[in-house]
Amino acid sequence: MSSLIKLRRQPKADEKPKASLRILLISPSYAPSRNTMYFPIGLSYVAAYVRKFGYEVVPLNMNHWDAEERYQQLERVLREERIDVVGITGITIAFNEIERIIQFVRPRSQAQIVLGGGITSCESELVLSTLKPDYMVVSEGELIFLNLLQTMESGGDPGDVRGIWYFKDGKPCSTGEGDGIGNLDDLPQPDLDLFGMEEHLAIQCEQQFSYHESHLVGSKMIPITASRSCPFRCTFCYHAGMGKYRRHSIVATVEHIKACIEKFGVRYFMIYDELFSANKARLIEFCDLVKDLSIRWYCQLRVDQMDQLLLHRMKAAGCHYISYGFESGSDTVLESMQKKITAAQIAKAVKMTREARIGIQANFLFGDIVETEQTLQETLAFQQANELFFVDWSAVIPYPGTQLFDRAIERNQIPDRDLFIRSMGNVSNYLWKHMINLTDLPDARFRELYVELRELNDQNHRKVRTIVEAGEALGPTRSTMTFRCPTCDHVDTGAVIPYPPECTQGGAPNLKSPIGIPGMNVVCPDCMRKHHLVAKAIPHVGQIYAEFQRSLDALKASQKEVVVLPAVDRFYGVVFEDLDLSGLKVAAVLDTREHRIGASFLGQTTIKLDQTSAAQQVGRAAIVLPWVEYDTAVATLLAAGFAREDIVCWNEYFAAAMLGDDAAQERKPGHEPRVGFGAPLPETFSPSKAWARTEPNKALVRSS
């Protein structure tokens, strides 16, 4: 076990400590575009600490740029700045991105590369051997990184620095566990300015809207931490390298909040802690100290510590959202996960939190080691009984460092650890292509249940639909709407709704997605409950639906045989509710995905899409339903001899509507998007024309 020590005396401001090393600290991004969901607080603490000892820090927060510009910025820094040490932080899912950064830096700089963060604390030898930094800091960075810098500067032996991995005689070597920090209040406040908090706040408006959670009133939000690690040890959770659970004092936390208010003018705070407080007294103290600051805040808590008076006190002090760890509604699964809570406690916390008009964020996890069809049914019944329609389903992931990872290793389910960790670099890709079944359910049934649960998320959302009262398309990517919360009757008038959400600040729609299918979960600003705005109910999106449906209806009327792609599984329910596919003369179904080959869809057995199978369908019309791989499918059809006018492609309708005909054709050389079977794009559908007012969607308007 590492020891917790009191921090050494920090130099006073007038002592002007000198240090020769110049350090580039890099925070990788976990998203392809600019990312405001993450701010490098940990690296901000490290930077603030080493700067106190005279080291000059050059920051690079890659979250502020899209994928390509990040590396342009990195190249610029390496070219223009004198850099002696490159520090990189990250967690396991950043493995591939960190590898790319290291490989980018090596030929451009002689600087020593130091890797830190959660990624170094599990499978340390593999990470060092594969990514090949010069050093790895394991556990908390402030003390260990400072000791390493001072040793590098003095020419000392790195083997004397506890808490690192490095190469000794060409072989990975560990120096054992380093010291942890005894009193977090001894640390200087994190250097938020250095890593671009102003920029972080400026781009938050780009992500005000999302499919998962959309807020009609944008709020700039500052993330803070009040503790480190967690006193609990759930089987699926990763704490390696975090050490013992420790907390800043509430007084110090509130002083940090006050400093942020003064500096940035922001009054909304997200408390990043895995567990903000393990006892009520600490929560009460916090509420008492912030109640007059006129702030709003979000935190993560346990259901077993809540009571009604405490929740009302939190609400009065500005708490507007709580993230709870539900995970399951089955006591059997909760016990296996070592959650140390019961389903009854979850239900009670839900009722009390709603009574206090505080929003709830939580998830259900499928796939614990004791999960069975019976335990799954218990959780499904629990979800419905408590109307947890926005507590979405995902799957248990055996992250390195968790008990579940160890179990997967024991069962020989991870034959290649390197490949497994790399697969987690894209969590969505992992869940759909590489997911490990830790249960005793057959693999085919396990996957089938997972797909059904993801579909259930959509169905559940639609049980609490936005009550649309009026709407008007403002252009190709936005509409103005008036709607009512179905829970509390709060009315929002004139809300401007961007769709898809990535177009919030004029961004381009992501056509390589099931665009137009997912709706948006809107948070009511009054009761803090979510309601679901169906995509088809948004005026400018509804127009595209109408045009696509006219194309389908034209095919029905012509009685021409059609081939359909793909055999939809994800979003199956939404597609069949919002589009009328009945009456089509379906002759074949094609798909590229192995797990769908042989599946029954629209009365046909799905066959594999390739040049040969596509050529066999020439002479029929092709309907390409919402699909991430739509462009590959269309290219295969064209290469096989399909006439362009015989292809009706959902994603290309959105390209035509949102980007215009010219832009759509630019994106797809040789493709002429059509609306209506065999007919060119009608003038009334052009985004360059006036967008017509639409009537309320009668199906979504609640009867009086």
Residue spans for each PLM region:
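Generic structural signal for well-ordered alpha-helices
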Residues: 43, 47, 74, 99-102, ...
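Radical SAM [4Fe-4S] cluster-binding motif and immediate context
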Residues: 191-360, 494-505, 511, 518-522
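Hydrophobic, well-ordered beta-alpha structural blocks that scaffold small-molecule cofactor pockets
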Residues: 487-489, 524-704
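Conserved C-terminal portion of the radical SAM core fold
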Residues: 66, 85-89, 114, 261-272, ...
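A short helix->loop->beta-strand "cap" motif at the edges of active sites that frequently abuts
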Residues: 107-112, 133, 295, 319, ...
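C-terminal accessory regions of radical SAM enzymes
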Residues: 4-7, 15-17, 21-33, 163-168, ...
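Glycine-rich beta-alpha loop elements in corrinoid/cobalamin-binding modules
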Residues: 49-184, 394-401
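Glycine- and acidic-residue-enriched helix-capping/strand-helix junction motifs
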Residues: 33-43
